[in-house]
Amino acid sequence: MLYHLLYPLHTTYSYFNVFRYITFRTIYAAITALIICFLLGPWLIRKLRELKMGQVIRDDGPEAHLSKQGTPTMGGVLIIFAVVVSTLLWANLTIDYVWLVLMVTLGYGLIGFADDYRKLTRQSSRGVSGKVRLACEVCIALLVSVVLYAKPGFNSTIAIPFFKTVLPDLGWGYIFLSTFIIVGAANAVNLTDGLDGLAIGPAITCFMTYLLFAYFAGNFKIASYLQIPGVAGVGELSIFCGAIVGAGIGFLWYNTYPAQVFMGDTGSLSLGGALGCLAIVTKQEILLAIVGGIFVLETFSVIFQVGWFKLSHGKRIFRMAPIHHHFELKGWAEPKVIVRFWIISILLALLAISTLKLR
C-alpha cells in the first residue's frame, strides 16, 4: 500500500525512490510487525484472560506442564494480524505470489482458530475432528498447488540442494508434492509447538533463510550467478518473510519461558502453511527438510513412536513423543530443551544457506 502510494512520487521527490528497493521495504516490514506485536501483545493477553481463553493441558502429558493450565492461547491471531498488516503496507500488491501466501496464512490460521475455539468451548485437548481438519488443509493446499501449476511460466521442476544440474521435472505430479509439502509443514510446526517458544524460534530462522532465497530467486542476475531457479516477482516475498520474522520476535517477547501467551493452532498452522508455500514458490522445496530439520525431527519422532507402538504391541522408542517431551522426561529443564533446539535450528539454517555455494 505504501509502495503504491509513495513510490510514484519519486519523480517529484527523489527520496521516495527508496521504496523501489526490496531490502528497504523488508526491513521496515519487519519493524512494523515487531512494533504491532509489542504494542498489542499486552492488550491481547489481557483480553484473552478476560474471555477465559486459557490453554487446556492434556492429562497424559509431562506433570510439569500442568502449571501451564489456563495460560492464554490463540495468540497466533496477533502474529497473523501483524504479518498481514505489515505485508499489505510494504509489499508490491500487484505480485500474485504475495496474495497466494497471504491466502494460505489466513486459511490455515482460520483452521487453527476453529480448532482452538472448539478445544476451549469443550474444555478438552481435542478440537476439530482430525479428518475434518486434514480435509480442510488439503483443500487449501491443493487449490494453491493447482493455481501455481497453471500459472504461465511456473515450472514443475524441483531443485536438489548441493546438486546444481539435478532438476527433475515432476509434471502434474508436482501438484501432489506441493500439496504434501504445505500440509506436512503446517502439521510439523503444529507438533513442535509444545514448549514455550519452541516452535516460534525455529520458525524465525526458517523464514529468515527463505527471506534470502526469495530475494535471490527474484533477482535473475543473482539467481543465475548462484545457479538457483529464478522466479519473476518472488523477491516481493522477502517482505512477507521479513514481516513474519518481526512478528515472530515480537511474539517471542511474550511467549518465551515462562510463557504469558501461547500461539495455539491458530499460529502454528498458519506459520507452517506459509512456510510450506514459500518453499514451493521459491522453488526450494527440498531445502525445507534441511532448514526445517527441527520440525522434521519432531514429526518423525511421532510417526516412529506410533508405528513402533503398534508393531511391537505396546513398546515405545521414546519416553514420550514428540521428541521434546522425551528430553523433558529424561530430566532436561524446559529452557534447556528449547534453547538447544534453537541452536540446532540456527545450525541447520546455516547449512541450508551454504547450499548456495556448495553445488
From Swiss-Prot:
Signal peptide: none annotated. It holds the Pfam family MraY_sig1. The keyword Secreted does not apply. One of its GO terms (molecular function) is UDP-N-acetylmuramoyl-L-alanyl-D-glutamyl-meso-2,6-diaminopimelyl-D-alanyl-D-alanine:undecaprenyl-phosphate transferase activity. The chain crosses the membrane at residues 26-46, 75-95, 97-117, 134-154, 166-186, 197-217, 233-253, 261-281, 286-306, 336-356. It is found in: Cell inner membrane. It is a multi-pass membrane protein. GO terms for cellular component: plasma membrane. Its EC number is 2.7.8.13. InterPro entries: Glycosyl_transferase_4 (IPR000715), PNAcMuramoyl-5peptid_Trfase (IPR003524), PNAcMuramoyl-5peptid_Trfase_CS (IPR018480). GO terms for biological process: cell division; cell wall organization; peptidoglycan biosynthetic process; regulation of cell shape. It comes from the Bacteria. It catalyses: UDP-N-acetyl-alpha-D-muramoyl-L-alanyl-gamma-D-glutamyl-meso-2,6-diaminopimeloyl-D-alanyl-D-alanine + di-trans,octa-cis-undecaprenyl phosphate = di-trans,octa-cis-undecaprenyl diphospho-N-acetyl-alpha-D-muramoyl-L-alanyl-D-glutamyl-meso-2,6-diaminopimeloyl-D-alanyl-D-alanine + UMP. It is an enzyme of class 2 (transferase). Keywords: Cell cycle, Cell division, Cell inner membrane, Cell membrane, Cell shape, Cell wall biogenesis/degradation, Magnesium, Membrane, Metal-binding, Peptidoglycan synthesis, Transferase, Transmembrane, Transmembrane helix. Its cofactor is Mg(2+). Belongs to the glycosyltransferase 4 family. MraY subfamily. HAMAP family: MraY. PANTHER family: PHOSPHO-N-ACETYLMURAMOYL-PENTAPEPTIDE-TRANSFERASE (PTHR22926), PHOSPHO-N-ACETYLMURAMOYL-PENTAPEPTIDE-TRANSFERASE HOMOLOG (PTHR22926:SF5). This is Phospho-N-acetylmuramoyl-pentapeptide-transferase. It comes from Syntrophus aciditrophicus (strain SB). The lineage of its organism: Bacteria, Pseudomonadati, Thermodesulfobacteriota, Syntrophia, Syntrophales. The gene is mraY.
